[in-house]
């Protein structure tokens, strides 16, 4: 009977979910998530495909301009916009970041401008991202971007 009890306790210990102390979430993680999101936008701003791929997961997905896009599709959209003369200025505001061991979520306002010079107009986006931690660090797995229409003038 004693052996059965020991075996039962051993199985229960192995099958129990890991405690939060095994995988802490810290202010440093919040800062790393913030940097990972900003690194993705920095790569897009200068059409740096290598840096973009380092900043996102292989299965990255974006909801942008009312469409679902892969990482390659989003990169090409921005790169082609730049090649056509369009300027896109992003200014990512403070982020709200939440997370746990291997996943994180971030949300922010992005206030900037876009257009073909000299017709550059103010733009505002509300954005959020889901990130995954890997051995290489935090990577953006999903981006959702919604353009906010300018307020009508009275």
Regions found by a protein language model. Name each.
Residues 5-14:
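Sec-dependent N-terminal signal peptides
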Residues 16-58, 102, 152-154:
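Short, low-complexity N-terminal intrinsically disordered segments enriched in polar/charged residues
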Residues 21, 124-154:
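Short beta-strand edge/turn micro-motifs at domain boundaries
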Residues 49-100, 119-121:
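A solvent-exposed, acidic/Ser-Thr-rich amphipathic alpha-helical stretch
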Residues 89-92, 107-109, 122-128:
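Short, surface-exposed coil-to-beta transition loops
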Residues 101-112:
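A short hydrophobic beta-strand element
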């Amino acid at each position: 009977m004693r052996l059965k009890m020991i075996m039962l306790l051993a199985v229960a210990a192995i099958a129990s979910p890991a405690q939060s102390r095994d995988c802490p979430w810290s202010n440093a993680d919040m800062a790393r998530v913030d940097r990972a999101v900003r690194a993705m936008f920095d790569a897009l701003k200068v059409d740096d495909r290598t840096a973009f791929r380092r900043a996102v997961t292989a299965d990255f997905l974006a909801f942008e301009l009312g469409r679902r896009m892969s990482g390659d599709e989003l990169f090409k959209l921005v790169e082609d916009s730049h090649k056509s003369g369009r300027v896109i200025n992003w200014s990512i505001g403070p982020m709200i970041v939440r997370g746990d061991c291997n996943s994180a979520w971030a949300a922010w306002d992005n206030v900037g401008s876009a257009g073909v010079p000299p017709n550059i107009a103010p733009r505002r986006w509300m954005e959020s991202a889901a990130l995954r931690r890997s051995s290489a660090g935090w990577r953006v797995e999903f981006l959702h971007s919604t353009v906010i229409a300018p307020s009508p003038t009275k």
